[in-house]
């Protein structure tokens, strides 16, 4: 049986005090978590505190996003890869692609630069998010959108992709809405992604995640999808009891 990865994207749900409390409680579940593959994505301001509090060797910590510049640079509010000691970084989440208030939308070209920087940095693995909006889904454009988003993975990125890159399919219309595609719909999209990856990064071992309203009530149903290697979970992962229930249902 393959090991399923649980990536907990806490977004802005937990402040530093909440994050520390969460990890302290998590440390008490050493036996349950011993054979699990877990990644925590706290807010940038909480990463150091989470790492200092964590005592579980198999739980890694990552950033929710990074700036396109890896070196110190005059970018107000930016966070570079060099500034924080992390194991993973999320790139291209829809909340950075589409929902920035000032409309500085991360386009596909910028996403390509970011994921390449993450993988080329050394020692950091990337989770690259793709997915369609509801309008695109209703127009039957899901594959076209994902094809365009994946296209940036060619070139330099393929040199670093093997065992360092994960693709997370997150339909934008499912994130935080409680609406989840059917297992068949998810499987069809993941199969398409795998097909495209075989062309873009031939021979690379790249995992496939699903994200979008995943919780303790639907995780078992989603686990029936053979193509899924893990889950990128938002709101439910920031609620300790829900998170533990998800972990218990993984195997």
Predicted regions and their residues:
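Active-site loop-to-helix "anion-binding N-cap" substructures in soluble metabolic enzymes
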Residues: 1-251
């Amino acid at each position: 049986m393959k090991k399923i990865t649980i990536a907990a994207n806490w977004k802005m749900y937990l402040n530093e005090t909440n994050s520390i409390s969460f990890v302290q409680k998590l440390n008490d579940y050493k036996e349950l978590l011993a054979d699990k593959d877990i990644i925590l994505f706290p807010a940038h301001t909480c990463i150091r505190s989470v790492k200092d509090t964590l005592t579980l060797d198999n739980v890694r910590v990552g950033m929710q996003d990074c700036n396109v510049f890896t070196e110190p640079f005059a970018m107000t509010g930016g966070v570079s890869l060099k500034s924080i000691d992390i194991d993973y970084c999320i790139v291209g989440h829809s909340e950075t692609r589409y929902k920035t208030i000032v409309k500085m939308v991360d386009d596909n070209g910028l996403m390509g630069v970011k994921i390449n920087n993450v993988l080329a940095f050394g020692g950091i693995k990337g989770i690259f998010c793709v997915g369609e909006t509801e309008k695109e889904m209703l127009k039957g454009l899901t594959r076209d959108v994902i094809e365009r988003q994946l296209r940036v993975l060619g070139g330099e990125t393929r040199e670093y992709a093997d065992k360092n890159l994960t693709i997370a399919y997150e339909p934008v219309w499912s994130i935080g809405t409680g609406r989840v595609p059917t297992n068949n719909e998810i499987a069809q999209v993941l199969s398409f992604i795998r097909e495209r990856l075989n062309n873009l990064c031939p021979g690379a071992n790249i995992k496939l995640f699903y994200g979008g309203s995943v919780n303790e009530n639907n995780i078992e149903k989603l686990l029936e999808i053979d193509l899924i290697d893990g889950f990128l979970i938002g709101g439910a992962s920031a609620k300790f009891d829900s998170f533990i229930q998800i972990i218990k249902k993984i195997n």
